[in-house]
Each structure stands twice: as structure tokens, then as C-alpha cells.
Amino acid sequence: MFTSSAAKTGRRRASTAKKSEDELVVDRVPNLIDGSISSGPISTGPDSDQNNKKKLPNPFAPKINNLGKDGQTIEQGSMLENKSRENEGDGGSPECVTPNHTDIGTSLGQVTTKGNECHDKYIGRGSPPNERGGSRPSQERGDSFVAIKYPSMLTTLAVMLNYDIHNLYEFMMAVLNVTKELNDPNVLVERAVFDAMQYSRSRGIGDRESYSMFCYMIHGYASLMRLAEEPWSDGVSSNESEIHIKASDMKKSVGVTLTVKPNSLWVCNKNDFARLICIFTLPDDIIAFLRTDGEDCYGGSNIYVGLDISKPPYIPLRDVEEP
């Protein structure tokens, strides 16, 4: 049958379009939960399965730095990775898919997820109940805690410690249950650990050893909540996309402005001077450090904020009684 040149040209164009579609390349977003990315862009071509299975360490995954005398650097999750594997089958994590997208709420505890069947059970609305009067809406805590109202802080902590985000969220929400009435930071941490352990154990989450690392997070989290109330703090301000924390620590003669963008693991302010893992303001017996990788940390170099996890936990875990 005779075929016109126009028809042949049309088929060639269709074939070319099909080939281009098969070879379409899409950038892959780093996986912040398992700390990995693909070895290259995502390919939908004939070798896509093989290409997309290759993974390299995520260059954007945070490192927890050990500022000990020997100058070692501890990689992300190295201390918890083996423990989490050993603990599989002993209660373990809730069988739940980690949400891929989080809507930023307007206050603490207002976290919603898209397409996550575990939303109501593990994320919930507001704080989980405790033994002393049930849950309290997060709004009662007021705007003085604006610095930590974004759930991306919890996500970042989970990534840092290689821990399940649902467990971490429940643990932190249990901590927030007791922060309103308590002023003394030591009592706050003690009581928070007790409440969180009781609540988490009742849900079959984690084990005793896992909580030793949580003490770091608890104190850092509580300290961040107090940041705006410290005498040396210049205050906290925020908008829908950024949090600005200005602080001048007179003991260390340090003045910094930290900018945090919700749902961002690595962030920089307009001067490109701050590159953050997470924000902790800790007492002297737990080292919170600003480590620079340049000559002048306020002149454009990166500033890393993290924890020295070589030291014992702030509150050693024991069979605590209710304070």
C-alpha cells in the first residue's frame, strides 16, 4: 500500500517523541529519612530499574560532630543504627509509613499529613494524653514558643538520630504535656523524661536504652523553648516561611542570627552565614557548639550547631519516680 511522505514524517516524529519520553530525566529529591539519594538522576529509560537502585550517601545528610580531644567525627546515626536493629521485634516502631509531605501548622502540635493512613493514630491533633489531666491544646502554650512551632524541627531530629519520626513525634508531644507548669529546666527534663517513658512504654514504643539518647533531644528541645525568655536573648520573630532567632550569649561573647526555613534540612540566611543541622541551646555541662570551617564564622563561613554525643546524657536514665 502506498504511504505518503507526510505519513512517514508523522510516524518519525511520533517515534522521536516516544524516544524522548522514554529518556526523560527527572531530578531525585534526597531521601531525608534513610539518608540516601540515587547515584544519578532518575531515568525512565530501559535501564531505569538498575540505575535507580544505585544509591550513594546523601551529601546533605547531617553529621553529628564529636568535639573530643581526638577530634573524631561521628557520622549520622552511627550510635543508634546498631541499637535500632537489635531492638527489632521488641515492641519496635509502629507499623506506619513515614509521611512524605507535612503541612505546616499554625501552632505546636497542629501537624497534618497528606496520604498517610497513620495520621489520626500517630500524629493526631494536639498533644497526647498523660496521667495528670489529659491532653492540652498546643495553643495554650502561646506565642512565646514560636521558635519551635514548626514540625520540621522534629523531622530534622529524627534524621539526625536515625529514628522513626512517629516515635519521635509521640515522645516530644509527651514532653510538651508537662512544660507549661514547670519553670526549672532540670525539673522540666526530669519530669519530661518520666512522662515520655511512661507514655511510650504504654504504647510499646522503643526500649530503655533508646531513651538515653532522647535525653539529649529533650534538653535541647526544652532549651530552645526557653530561648525567647532568656535575659540575654534579643527575641524571636517569625513569618510563614522563616524563623529568626537573635541571641547574644554574654558568657561566650557570641552574637548570632539563626534563620530556619520549615521543612529544610540545610538552611542559610541571606548572608549565607549559617548552615544548620539543628538548633540547641544547652547548659555548659552539655556541649552545644558552633563549629566553623572557615576563618571568620561571621564573615560568610558555615556554622554548624549540634551536640557532643560523646558525653553521658544530661539526665542518666533510671527507674524514676514521679517528681
Curated annotation (Swiss-Prot):
Q: What is this protein called?
A: Non-structural protein 9
Polar residues: compositionally biased ranges: 99-115
Species in which this protein is naturally found: Rice gall dwarf virus
Say what the protein does: Constituent of viral factories.
Using the UniProt record, give the first listed, main subcellular location: host cell
Disordered: where is this region? Answer: 1-142
**Phylogenetic classification of the source organism:** Viruses, Riboviria, Orthornavirae, Duplornaviricota, Resentoviricetes
Q: Which UniProt keywords apply?
A: Host cytoplasm
Where in the cell is the protein located? Answer: Host cytoplasm
